[in-house]
Amino acid sequence: MDDDDFDDIPDEDLMLAFTQATGNITSHHPSNSKQLASSAKPPAQAWPISDSARRIVTPTVSQGQATATGRAKTASKPTTSATTSRPSLAQSSQRKNLRQTTLWGGTLEEDAQPAPQAVSNRPFRADMPPEQPTHHEIDIEEMKTWVYPMNLGPIRDYQFSIVKNGLFNNTLVALPTGLGKTFIAATIMLNYIRWTKTAKAVFVAPTKPLASQQVQACLSIAGIPRSQATLLTGETPPVLREDEWATKRLFFMTPQTLMNDLSKGYADPKSIVLLVIDEAHRATGDYAYVKVVEFLRRFSKSFRILALTATPGSSLEGVQDVIDNLGISHVEIRTEESIDIRQYVHSRDINTITFDPSDEMMEVRDLFSKALKPLVTKLSSQNIYYGRDPMSLTTYGLMKARNDWMAGPGRHVNQGTKFSVIATFAILQSLAHSIKLLNFHGIKPFYNNLAEFRTTEEEKGGKGSKLKRQVLEDENFQKMMDMIEGWMKIDGFLGHPKLEYLCETLVNHFMDAGEGSNTRAIVFSEYRDSAEEIVRILNKQPLIKATVFVGQADSKRSEGMKQKQQIETIEKFKNGAHNVLVATSIGEEGLDIGQVDLIVCYDASASPIRMLQRMGRTGRKRAGNIVLLLMKGKEEDKFNEAKDNYATMQRMICEGSRFTFRHDLSSRIVPRDIRPEVEKKVVEIPLENSQNPELPEPKRSAARMRTKPAKKKFNMPDGVETGFIKASFFGQAGAKTAKPPARPPAPKETDFIAERPKLESILLSTSQENELRRNYTKIPLGHSKVEELDIDWYRHPTSRRVVQKTIHVKHGEYTKRCVKLFRSLAKSQAPANRYTKPYGETDTSSWELIPLPPLADETEGETSRKGQKKRPRLESGQEAEEAEQYAAPKKRQATAKTKSTGVSKQTNKPRARHTALISDCEEGGNEYDGNVDDDEQSRPRNFRSKGRGRGSGRGKKSQPKQGDPNVDYGDDCTRTSDMEMGTDGSDDGADLEDFIVSDGEVTSSLQHRPRGSTSPTTAPDAGSSSLSSKTGRKQQAPDSFASDEDDGDVFGPKFVPVTASAAKGSLPSTARREKPKPFYVPVELPATQDTTDGDDDLPDIEFLSAKRKREGTGTGMRTGSPGHVKVGDTSKGGSGGDQTREKPSGGAASHARARKRTVVMDSDDDQE
């Protein structure tokens, strides 16, 4: 029967196929010509038939008709009645008399004959809408077969049947523990991964230990490559989970993790084709299983569900909830008495042991009952709680009584009475748990619970509940606690008769097994306190190595076990490090712990599910023993009730008449024209599955170092309109936003494919090959290898500090910042190393040893910047360093000075001594100002200084503003004596006779003027004309400027000097022989009316000269008449030519009277 073609066909499909086959024979009988005529016409409506019935009906139809039927859409194309309709033996007379009429009684179609209809016991097939094809990308060739692995030995009939139905239906599999539910799941996952190209299969389990256990089983049975599988938990970072969903196809995880990944968009619900649910009896209420399936159905209906459990439920309603929530359409259930699994179930010897309370327990119960009697009497006297015995209190009974009273009489009592009753119920509910611990688990857990109750109340002081203090201060309660404390000090005190029997049972079991045996035992306890007490007692016994196995939650007296610790504990138990495992409810479900020969249930549970799960831990591979330790009375009754309930539920599920299955939610994934055939073979296990024993958990690597996951993805069902619409469209039928015009398709690379050129046009000619060989492929003579030249990044450093000229595009903000930065870095270097080349060559000119002339007076060397002090006298070692800082004035200062004078003079050729200084001045002249454009810098500016008002004393000096061009002006006078003019080299002061004092002279200089001097009201024109005639230069118009790009302009914009040949006079012979001065162009400016109105005091030249001599600042000397000033500089050695500068003191001096003197240092040696 295993290989029979029709062994998997339900009985109702067989009956339907027989009916259709008989109908076809009757319809073709020659005696019924009318039916023959009607059967030749196409039917008005096509009816789908089941797959099982189609396999039987097909032989009665021609091969062409069968092929057309298999590929046609149901209810979409009319076909022959033999293949798509359901004819019956006799047509219904009622159906023949029906005809469609109009509203006025006329017949719509007189000649139309109704299509033959068949009477079916399955009306849902006719009511179902047309099936939609799956959206998953399938592999047609692989789908023609489905693989049944033969790796585990002979085929088990029940496993083969369940796998066959689970591939095509949403199936609930209920098998006793240890009968291969994992093998069934692995086989179905293997086939769906084969059938689809990119779809994913997900295995969900309630806990991580269960999920981890299924990973190894599926990889070793089904042969799915380990590289395509992954284990995801809540501890996995979201970034790694997102990457795993994009690359893997088989997932093992908890339902909570799957729900989070679906809701956050890491997992695509449309990509899941198979969902395997372990411990499916949990799929009730708001559990994560229910939420996951609901979420998937919102976006996709083309996925298969396989639910695995040992006990579907404890009631009819619970089983129906599982069927509805998971969309189950088929149930495969087996019991231990089923024929096809009986040979695979090992015998289990169940021993039930009942106990009576010990004397110590009776004494404790009596004292505790007296302590609780006042509270119970208070409730019973008001007809709120009808129990009289305090030791029969239960948490559920008290909660139900309180809710009934609050819904009834409690609504009409005053608030004081209501609060008092609620407080009494709360205290009794907390103490009812202690009563349960005393009756079923022992005195020690009972004492620990009450000690915690007492400690919590004592910590509150006098602010706690009065009713709790009443219980704690009761004489019977205190006596009971003192008595228990005395018992616990006794060595070997057990506290419950179950503990004594448990120790004896386990010791006898290991003694009978013999030393070195591989036998193990599991003890199940409901509460953690009781489990820890059992471990403490068992470890004192010989041959017993016990350990506890609890959940992850922390209690008030102990910590939970992390998932890693749980897995390690199970591995140690399998390896033999521990031979007794004391577990709570976490060890009841699904754990394949290994060869367990003895199960001890320390307490009984009223739930048949938990009872069967506990018993299923043994008897998997060999016969096992089960010992039930029950207390007489209530606990024994609960066990019997659970046992009867389990047998009743198994019988009802097998019948199937009490449940409604959801065929509408079990969509077809395999196309109807494809009929997969079984292929029984040994599946090859990839080598990678056995090489790495670790779990396939994702690990963070260097290539996956993203710290943030991608943005949340919002999944939308098919056909949903997304985006925004106008507010005016609301309420309008079919209102949609206007679609933008379609863009032309982007050009493809193939559109620009050029024609293939001729071979001669792309190959090198003979001459080109010789040139290639001579110039590029051959090494030059005398070279052993090809030279590689490195770019010298230190060449031309000064070009980086200047903003070069542009034509069409201006320099950007970043370019100007970089230039300014390089200029600042250049200024920060030491002067001694500034001109040293980086490649080892140094300047041998010894320019540092050239002596510098003495500096100007401190009163004239005030700097213009805010906060800077006067320039001090420098030593010889510092002269070279400070020379450059004072040798290059600002560009705008030079511009303002040039504009104020209005005349430029021709300078001599610069000396070789100042070559380095000039390069720095060029850099300073183009210094970038962030607030001024290049164009604005090139324009001349007319700055006018404001003098101080007259007053009796020296007024407070105003602070200079940033960027003000007048900040370098002096206090009382304007000196232009630094203009370099041709002199005869003498030092008698005759070259300063043209320093004419005009009307702009202030009172500070008049007090030192001789009485016979020229009047200060001299006309400005005369002064300027005389100055021009004596200097022998023409006055230049103010608007005749030189170009900014002139190499000689080291201080910015300047006037075009007039050549010597055009001057009225001629320079002295000494000046003609000298080279032009290197860094300054003297200018002249005629006096104006504005410059004669100055009111600042100008100190006398003789007074300043005498002061300088007293201070010893230099050997310089100032002599001459009040109208002229002569400045002489002497060298250190006393030799060398003197420089004399002559400057008018008329209108030009008054206009720039607030300007400081610009210090220009020069060498005393004028000779080449």
From Swiss-Prot:
Q: Where do Polar residues bias regions lie? A: 24-38, 59-68, 89-104, 895-907, 1001-1030
* GO molecular function terms noted in the UniProt entry: 3'-5' DNA helicase activity; ATP binding; ATP hydrolysis activity; four-way junction DNA binding; four-way junction helicase activity
Helicase C-terminal domain residues are 506-665
Q: Where is the composition biased (Basic residues)?
A: 701-714, 941-959
- Which InterPro entries does this UniProt record tie to the protein? FANCM/Mph1-like_ID (IPR039686), FANCM_DEXDc (IPR044749), Helicase/UvrB_N (IPR006935), Helicase_ATP-bd (IPR014001), Helicase_C-like (IPR001650), P-loop_NTPase (IPR027417)
Residues the entry annotates as binding ATP: L175, P176, T177, G178, L179, G180, K181, T182
Acidic residues bias locations: 920-936, 985-996
Reaction catalysed? ATP + H2O = ADP + phosphate + H(+)
> Main location per UniProt?
nucleus
- The main enzyme category here is hydrolase
What the entry lists under Gene3D superfamilies is as follows: hef helicase domain (1.20.1320.20), P-loop containing nucleotide triphosphate hydrolases (3.40.50.300)
Name the residue ranges of motif: DEAH box: 278-281
Q: What is its EC number?
A: 3.6.4.12
**UniProt GO BP:** double-strand break repair via synthesis-dependent strand annealing; interstrand cross-link repair
Q: Does the keyword Nucleus apply?
A: yes
One matching Pfam family: ResIII
Region Disordered, as annotated, extends over: 24-132, 690-717, 830-1168
Q: What does this chain do? A: ATP-dependent DNA helicase involved in DNA damage repair by homologous recombination and in genome maintenance. Capable of unwinding D-loops. Plays a role in limiting crossover recombinants during mitotic DNA double-strand break (DSB) repair. Component of a FANCM-MHF complex which promotes gene conversion at blocked replication forks, probably by reversal of the stalled fork.
The UniProt family comment states: Belongs to the DEAD box helicase family. DEAH subfamily. FANCM sub-subfamily.
Subunit structure comment from the entry: Interacts with the MHF histone-fold complex to form the FANCM-MHF complex.
Q: Which protein, by its recorded name, is this? A: ATP-dependent DNA helicase mph1
